[in-house]
Structure formats: structure tokens, C-alpha cells
Amino acid sequence: MKPIFRRVAVIGKYPGPGAVSASDSARQIIESIAQFVTQQDCELTLEAETAAHTGLTQYHTLDVEGIGRQCDLCLVVGGDGTMLGVGRRLAGYGTPLVGINQGRLGFITDIPLEGYQDALTPILHGDYEEDVRPLMQACVMRGGECVFEALALNDVVVNRGSTSGMVELRVEVDGVFVSNQRADGLIVASPTGSTAYALSAGGPMLHPSIPGWVLVPIAPHTLSNRPIVLSDATEVAIEVAGGRDISANFDMQSLASLQHGDRILVRRSAHRVCFLHPRGWSYFATLRKKLGWYEGGS
């Protein structure tokens, strides 16, 4: 049976310069996956940086945007951080993503590297679970102009520097004042991000099907400042009212330094990310496994 995905791209995590043994390992992993994909009668494309850093230059290559324009499916080899970066860049193209976990936790890169062939074969032939996740669009407003803009799949975080004191943040939802918060920072998390930094800060987990966000203070000065669940149809505005050495992070991968009076506006993006999982995948099974929940029995 012919695969339904004809043009398949592979984007891999690769080590920095000087890590020879890690580089050799990355090359072996990517080459194994590339060979497997071609054996499935698919046209293989390697992301250009992946090919250059692993020395696998014998394959057809494209940059990430080219993959979005020309490929039917993208395999992301790495951890959740790798997937977050790729997801944001491909969101505007609608390219479905499959995660092969080479990292630690792997909430969204859920296929283990060992035995990936058994999980990947049915997906390539159309047997999979589809999992669509929303994105957040954020911009930093300064003097009435947007000076920095980014997408986020997990979260938007406004926080203090490592050597500074608490920050004071004025929070509005749809133009309505909520509170001034004195804390180490504030997290606006999507359902995807609710199991990341927001969870460690005491926030709730949101099921991916919930069209909502969670607003989570980081170490608030007032203990009554608790997490709030919001509709993702709202616009959240966070204004820097006090503190120093303050920054805004988007999925902890892009950063903007902030000044007093800056406003960070967060709204739902028009783009979404589509993950494909093996048949039988379950969000709750993922939570049980990754968070070590008790399953009962003797």
C-alpha cells in the first residue's frame, strides 16, 4: 500500500561544535530515519541545517519555510523544545508534525526513538490520531508601536532578572482591569503549555480540547493571587508598572527586554499546529506516564 504522505521532511536535533561523539550519534539517528522513510516509498527531504550539521548532504534539502511550502509531513527528531520551535515556524503552512523523542520528557514528541518504525509505518499510511493545538500571538507595545512580536505554542512569560527583586505588573483582560501583581513574574499558558512552566508554578492542567488559557503568577507577594482560567477568545494585556531587568519570553526560546510602561498583548493566533500520534494515543495515558501517576494494582 502506498503511503498517503508522499513528501516527508525530517528535522533533527544536533549538537553544537566540538561535541564529536554526540554529533556521530545524531548522524546515525537521522540517517536511520531517513533510510526508513525512503524505504516506505516516500520522497525524503532533510532540513538544510540538519543536513549540514550531520554531514548527510546526499539527500534533498530545504529550509524550514521550504518544507512548509513543499512537504506533506514533517518528522521532528528531538525533544519538546525542538518541536516547539519547528511548530511555530511551520504553523502558517499547516504542515502536520510527528515527534520522535530524543529528549527527556516528551509530552508532544511522544514516539520513542527505540522502535520508532513500528509507530511510524501506520502513520505514513494514514492510520493516526490527529491532535490540533492553538497558538498565541504576542506583541510588545512601546509608545503605541509594536516593537517585538512572536508566536508561542506553550506560553508567554514576563519575569524578573536573576539578580533583581520582584516586578509589578498591571493585568487587564479585554480592556478590563484585573489587578496589579507583585511577583517574580506572570505566565500566560495555552493548554499545551499548562503542563510546562505553568504547572511547576502551581497552575492547573488544561485538556487540549479546552479553548482556554491559564494565567499563573510566579511566586506572588500576595498569596491570594491565584491562577485564573480564561477563554482564549480574550486579549490579555500585561503592563510593566515596576521593577527592573524585566523580560518577556515566548516558549522560553525568544526574548524581549522590557521597559517601564511596556505592554505585552497576548491574543489567540489564527494559526494552529497539527500533531499526528500513533493510533490509540491518549492525553491521559501521556500524563500518567510522564508525571508518574499511580496506576493501581499490586
Curated annotation (Swiss-Prot):
Protein task: Involved in the regulation of the intracellular balance of NAD and NADP, and is a key enzyme in the biosynthesis of NADP. Catalyzes specifically the phosphorylation on 2'-hydroxyl of the adenosine moiety of NAD to yield NADP.
Range of residues in the leader sequence: none
GO biological process terms on file: NAD metabolic process; NADP biosynthetic process
Enzyme class: transferase
Protein name: NAD kinase
NCBIfam families: PRK02155.1
Principal location: cytoplasm
E.C. designation(s): 2.7.1.23
Catalytic activity: NAD(+) + ATP = ADP + NADP(+) + H(+)
Binding site for NAD(+): D80, G81, N154, D155, R182, D184, T195, A196, Y197, A198, L199, S200, A219, Q253
Pfam name, any one: NAD_kinase_C
Cofactor field: a divalent metal cation
Family listed: Belongs to the NAD kinase family.
Active site: D80 (proton acceptor)
Alphabetic keyword roster: ATP-binding, Cytoplasm, Kinase, NAD, NADP, Nucleotide-binding, Transferase
Molecular function per GO: ATP binding; metal ion binding; NAD binding; NAD+ kinase activity
